[in-house]
UniProtKB/Swiss-Prot annotation:
GO terms for biological process: ribosomal small subunit biogenesis; rRNA processing. One of its GO terms (molecular function) is adenylate kinase activity. Broad-specificity nucleoside monophosphate (NMP) kinase that catalyzes the reversible transfer of the terminal phosphate group between nucleoside triphosphates and monophosphates. Also has ATPase activity. Involved in the late maturation steps of the 30S ribosomal particles, specifically 16S rRNA maturation. While NMP activity is not required for ribosome maturation, ATPase activity is. Associates transiently with small ribosomal subunit protein uS11. ATP hydrolysis breaks the interaction with uS11. It is an enzyme of class 2 (transferase). PANTHER family: ADENYLATE KINASE ISOENZYME 6, POS9-ACTIVATING FACTOR FAP7-RELATED. Its EC number is 2.7.4.3. Residues 108-118 are annotated as: LID. Keywords: ATP-binding, Kinase, Nucleotide-binding, Ribosome biogenesis, rRNA processing, Transferase. Gene3D superfamilies: P-loop containing nucleotide triphosphate hydrolases. The lineage of its organism: Archaea, Methanobacteriati, Methanobacteriota, Stenosarchaea group, Methanomicrobia. This is Putative adenylate kinase. Disulfide bonds: none annotated.
Amino acid sequence: MLIGLTGTPGTGKTSVSKLLEKKRQWKIIHLNELIKEEHLYTEVDEKRDSVVADMELVRSRLPELINEMEKEPANKVVILESHLAHYITDIVIVLRAYPPELKKRLEKRGYSEEKVNENAEAESIDLILAEAFEWCDKVFEINTTGRTAEETAGDVEKIIDSLLSGKEEQLQEYGPGSLDWIDSVP
């Protein structure tokens, strides 16, 4: 089963996915790292200190990588971790964070003020959640505000375990659309 773990930068995707990789031995594809390592991008955006992913190249590379991972008998879950994961997977978990907290997290990382504000604004208008609805069949949402990576990883586990066991009715608390932060960023 391929599941996307997406969200605005700073919501906890990488921390959570690394915990799940250790605890559950689920295979994780850190898509942003793959894009950089294998040069699956069209250009370097100096202003934003990032690369512009070539989604055609990304989509053509992933099936081979996922097939290799799924060959391992114990491996039932592959998680695609990235703020771009919702463009690729049919099932996605969107990690969210209250924009003022998100700003603090990104400032700690040393992001420029412009990049911090751009990401906080994207979070306040539900940008990634809205895109996930457009691209994915199943969308779940987890609020990471004031929570540890371990607590959030527990929620991700609950969602994935429920999907694997066919018990989606247990997942109403992760239904998207309950968070409204439009007024949180000036």
